[in-house]
Amino acid sequence: MQRGDGRNFNQLRPITITPGFQSFAEGSVLIEQGKTRVICSVSMEDKVPQFLRNSGTGWVTAEYSMLPRSTVTRTQRDSSAGKISGRSQEIQRLIGRSLRSCVDLAALGERSFIIDCDVIQADAGTRTASITGAYIALYLAFKKMVDMGILSKMPFTSQVAAVSVSIFKGNIVLDPCYDEDFQAEVDFNLVMNDRAEFVEIQGTAEGKTFSRDTLDQVLKLGEAGIWQLFDIQNSITRP
């Protein structure tokens, strides 16, 4: 299948990652995946949520937002609406869960690492790009803390990345752009670690149901895409 942007069904969009995109964050990247662009930045605080106080254990959490004109028509800021939208809550919880799955929280001490994922341009796949970029930003933050003697070792237990897969006009396609995502019959978001273990599988039938065989094909295609993302992450973290 030849797609509208010239890619084959199993190709990711072009990906560029710029580390150190923000000067003041403990770790930061700009991830560009096709026309989707997300700034991922990490801040460290010497405190933890109430439920972790005096536990000796740290925390990793995330916040997600979209700039008003990251979309074709203006998206209202959550602050203007007076509450975080349900979509933003869902996505930031997903990002937080995904990153916590690959970190030894006890190795952080009683410290919190807050990941801010701010979408500056949305062309589908913002939540998965946020996870892939957030891993690198968190890696850079941890490395800085180790270099400063604040952490005794890198606290990662695995590597994590994410990708979207859609069924578009009856075809399974990797990393859909907006036009494909908008018209997709089925949408999937896959999060996986480098032990080939899935952290999260989200699948929604928008206009068509799907079979177990189709699900297996989606997982196989998504897994192949995530291994490519691991290589891209490693080009920054393990040059």
UniProtKB/Swiss-Prot annotation:
GO terms for biological process: rRNA catabolic process; rRNA processing; tRNA processing. Its EC number is 2.7.7.56. GO terms for molecular function: 3'-5'-RNA exonuclease activity; tRNA binding; tRNA nucleotidyltransferase activity. Pfam families: RNase_PH, RNase_PH_C. HAMAP family: RNase_PH (MF_00564). Phosphorolytic 3'-5' exoribonuclease that plays an important role in tRNA 3'-end maturation. Removes nucleotide residues following the 3'-CCA terminus of tRNAs; can also add nucleotides to the ends of RNA molecules by using nucleoside diphosphates as substrates, but this may not be physiologically important. Probably plays a role in initiation of 16S rRNA degradation (leading to ribosome degradation) during starvation. This is Ribonuclease PH. The lineage of its organism: Bacteria, Bacillati, Chloroflexota, Dehalococcoidia, Dehalococcoidales. The gene is rph.
